[in-house]
């Protein structure tokens, strides 16, 4: 019996043998098309079963919360053949239809690679970037369906909400990333035009799923908390009536042991923090004294889809290579010998033919990636435009005591949940950018001297949908200038950021801001684009550049005055850090 499309593109089969799966899918699609052509109009008995009135009602109610309700309804109605009894059913049906659309986009890209004449090297690279982001999108959507099957029983409601929103937010980001690869010149834009319709369709389908997920989880959380509040009040009233005093010990959450470590930190995590006594699974040394001579070789030899931490010790030295920690390389840790001693460096850049996405010296995608005591560097100068030192799409990733050094687009916080602590990030234009949910704590963020006529932008956040749980949070950091900029800072305007995408979200809080930052604080991208839809916030900052009296007057900018409002941007809430940061072994703060 011929396999069904669902079987062909099941998560397990897709991951086991992607090329075989996609070939089988192509054959299956041709077979289905042939059968459809023969049987068209033969009998009404073969038509898709229409939705029942009750399913229609559920569908319309669920789609009412989306940004594209007509698409939301028509996609499911056209597919037919499903019984919808809840909003979760509608979300699952919508996501499954989105998977089919993503599969179609895959074949569109493959066809362009094979048949399009005269593709430039960068266009070929951009198309392969699209294949990579399509691969990631398929994984994310399959995982979304699996998580929906478990909802709401296997995790807390907030964990479910965080995971589901992150998966779909990342899927949306991937569509934008594919298209962004064709934005460098006019020739690129012709290829972009061939992809645009399919990519935008998937992005809109994902947007609808995200809106429904947000509506469902927000409602369920509110109902749960209301019930918990009533239960708590009833218990309190009963205790007061009985004149009973209940003592609750919460001090343990912040207790320290005799050596000054938090009591909840395991011995293994303490060793990671101390940076000594950690057993490496592989050692990289340029002089041949380790297991491998290159970082890329060590990563290639690491196990795939591992649930156990795999530590790669990178000895002191300069490693001139480009490294990718792919999606299947999970739980990898890079441990250097010091941020000034272990350096991974490259020079890929847009001017010389790369895409921004592909220019990264190091790209970390496999989930739970950790790095400490390393410098990630791109030596392409300011004249080479976009040249990324580090790109991160790894969920639950963290970086401690690392340097990210480049000029334009230094740190690409691409997608998923990320954390940086005690790091140095230096650059010029948009040097912290992307659409992850990321918190940077206790970091030094330094603008460098750019080319003549350029302006420095610390951030360029890329949120494209108001329901994405993404943004850049800079907390308890120091924002200043490198020595080469400090003496000429008046000649090179420097800003906290500008809106790369329509719903750009950036928060600067509890940080020291030097006078390198101009009084208006923030800059436009172009004209009035995104000024009413962005979310830019400042809270409790200090320093000569922290004054807000002369800040921009955009509708999307606001100075936060209440701690309760700032709390939602902390590591505990914004990236759900309470559930995973302790496992990194790195220092962190969950609150203000």
Swiss-Prot record:
CDD domains: PMEI-like_3. Gene3D superfamilies: Invertase/pectin methylesterase inhibitor family protein, Single-stranded right-handed beta-helix, Pectin lyase-like. Disruption phenotype: Early germination and reduced root hair production associated with lower expression of several pectin-degrading enzymes, genes involved in cell wall organization and remodeling and genes involved in lipid and protein metabolism, thus leading to a global decrease in proteolytic activity, however, cruciferin genes accumulate abnormally. Normal sensitivity to zinc Zn(2+). Optimum pH is 7.5 on homogalacturonan (HG) substrates with a degree of methylesterification between 60 and 80% and a random distribution of methyl esters. Residues 53-212 are annotated as: Pectinesterase inhibitor 3. The keyword Secreted applies. Substrate binds at residues 356, 386, 454, 498, 500. Residues 36-238, 36-273 form a propeptide. Regulated negatively by pectinesterase inhibitors (e.g. PMEI3, PMEI4, PMEI7 and PMEI9) in a pH-dependent manner, mainly in slightly acidic conditions (pH 6.0 and 5.0), especially in dark-grown hypocotyls; this processus relies on changes in the protonation of amino acids involved in intermolecular and intramolecular interactions. Pfam families: Pectinesterase, PMEI. Glycans are attached at residues 96, 215. Disulfide bonds join 423-443. The PMEI region may act as an autoinhibitory domain and prevent untimely PME activity during transport. In the N-terminal section; belongs to the PMEI family. This is Pectinesterase/pectinesterase inhibitor 3. It comes from Arabidopsis thaliana (Mouse-ear cress). The lineage of its organism: Eukaryota, Viridiplantae, Streptophyta, Embryophyta, Tracheophyta.
């Amino acid at each position: 019996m011929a396999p069904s499309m669902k079987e062909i593109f099941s998560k397990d089969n897709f991951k086991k043998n992607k090329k075989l799966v996609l070939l089988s899918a192509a054959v299956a699609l041709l077979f289905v098309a042939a059968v459809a052509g023969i049987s068209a109009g033969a009998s009404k008995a073969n038509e898709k079963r229409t939705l029942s009135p009750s399913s229609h009602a559920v569908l319309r109610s669920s789609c009412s919360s989306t940004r594209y309700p007509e698409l939301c309804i028509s996609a499911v109605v056209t597919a037919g053949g499903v019984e919808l009894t809840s909003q979760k059913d509608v979300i699952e049906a919508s996501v499954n239809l989105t998977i089919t659309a993503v599969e179609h986009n895959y074949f569109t890209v493959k066809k362009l690679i094979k048949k399009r004449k005269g593709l430039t090297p960068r266009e070929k690279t951009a198309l392969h970037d699209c294949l990579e982001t399509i691969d990631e999108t398929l994984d994310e959507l399959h995982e979304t369906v699996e998580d929906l099957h478990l909802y709401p029983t296997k995790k807390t409601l907030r964990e479910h909400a965080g995971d589901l929103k992150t998966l779909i937010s990342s899927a949306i980001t991937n569509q934008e990333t594919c298209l962004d690869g064709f934005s460098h010149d006019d020739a690129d834009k012709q290829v972009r035009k061939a992809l645009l319709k399919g990519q935008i369709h998937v992005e809109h389908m994902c947007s609808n799923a995200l809106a429904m997920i947000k509506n469902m989880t927000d409602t369920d959380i509110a109902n749960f908390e209301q019930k918990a509040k009533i239960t708590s009040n009833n218990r309190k009233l009963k205790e007061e009536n009985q004149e009973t005093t209940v003592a609750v010990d919460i001090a343990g959450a912040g207790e320290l042991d005799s050596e000054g470590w938090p009591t909840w930190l395991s011995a293994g995590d303490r060793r990671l923090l101390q940076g000594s006594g950690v057993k490496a699974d592989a050692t990289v040394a340029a002089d041949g004294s380790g297991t491998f001579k290159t970082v890329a070789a060590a990563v290639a030899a690491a196990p795939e889809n591992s649930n156990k931490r795999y530590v790669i010790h990178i000895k002191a030295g300069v490693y001139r290579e480009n490294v990718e920690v792919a999606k299947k390389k999970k739980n990898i840790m890079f441990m250097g010998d010091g941020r000034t001693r272990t350096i991974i460096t490259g020079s890929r850049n847009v001017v010389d033919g790369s895409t921004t996405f592909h220019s990264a010296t190091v790209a970390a995608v496999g989930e739970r990636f950790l790095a400490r005591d390393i410098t990630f560097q791109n030596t392409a100068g300011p004249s080479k435009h976009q040249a990324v030192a580090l790109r991160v799409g790894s969920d639950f990733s963290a970086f401690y005591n690392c340097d990210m050094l480049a000029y334009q687009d230094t740190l690409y916080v691409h997608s998923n949940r990320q954390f940086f602590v005690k790091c140095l990030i230096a650059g010029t234009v948009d040097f912290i950018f992307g659409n992850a949910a990321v918190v940077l704590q206790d970091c030094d963020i330094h603008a460098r001297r750019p080319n003549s006529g350029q302006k420095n932008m610390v951030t360029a956040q890329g949120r494209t949908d108001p329901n994405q749980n993404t943004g850049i949070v800079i907390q308890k950091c120091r924002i200043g200038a490198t020595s080469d900029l400090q003496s000429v800072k008046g000649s090179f305007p420097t800003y906290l950021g500008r809106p790369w995408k329509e719903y750009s979200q950036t928060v600067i809080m509890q940080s020291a801001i030097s006078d390198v930052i101009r009084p208006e604080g923030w800059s436009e991208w172009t004209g009035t684009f995104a000024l009413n839809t962005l979310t830019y916030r400042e809270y409790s900052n200090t320093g000569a550049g922290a004054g807000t009296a002369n800040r921009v007057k955009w509708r999307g900018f606001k100075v936060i005055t209440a701690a309760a409002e700032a709390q939602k941007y902390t590591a505990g809430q914004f990236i759900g850090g309470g559930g995973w940061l302790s496992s990194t072994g790195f220092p962190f703060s969950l609150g203000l």
